[in-house]
Amino acid sequence: MKKLFLLFALLVSAVQLSFADSALTSTEFYKAYLDVPIVKAAAERPHHLSEVAKAYLFDETNPLDVKLALINAVGPNPDGLATYGEYIEYCIQHFPKKKYGIAPNKRVTIQDIYKNASCEQMAALVYLYAMNYYSDTESVYGLMENAMQTPLTNKQSFMLPMGLVVAHTASAMNDLGNIYPAINYYVNSPENKDMRPKAIEIVMAYANRYKPYANKQ
């Protein structure tokens, strides 16, 4: 029984270690945006999404690359976070019913949020969800696939979180050979390079650690 328990403990530790070093948890590209007040504030209080931060994410006029940096600064937490749920509730409360033909007395649902989200809004939702629930790789990957079915934009900021999710899933499956190709493709193939070069440098520094594995395939 002791040996069985020890084996289980070792397996759990190995899984936790793999999640601790993944594309979602080990790419702190927010550091390239610390001159932006909203990102700096999030970095100073990680694992918390302020009302100001929620409003920033919700505002479609704000640039997606800064939104991603904000979410990245909030960071992941192995014990779980409430930030995704809190942001969804914010979206529900501030959803423009008239714009989307929803009756004033009808309660907005999470389905309404996703149904009417733009591709950039989907990118922020996917990334925030992934950083909250990164240990649930199946759900995270499924949400990413849904986002990729929306009308896409050929922007680096949209593709970045998708690539991080794909690479994270590969890491969870111990498929090390697909980590570098996934990140390299999703990050570097878009024509619109709207992420800061330093942010991409941070992400690719992580990806390059796995490049030798890709070369073996």
What are these regions (language model features)?
Residues P63, S118, K155-S157:
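Residues that mark the junctions of alpha-helical repeat units in TPR/alpha-solenoid scaffolds
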Residues L64, C119, A124-V126:
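Start-of-helix signal in alpha-solenoid helical-repeat scaffolds, especially tetratricopeptide repeats
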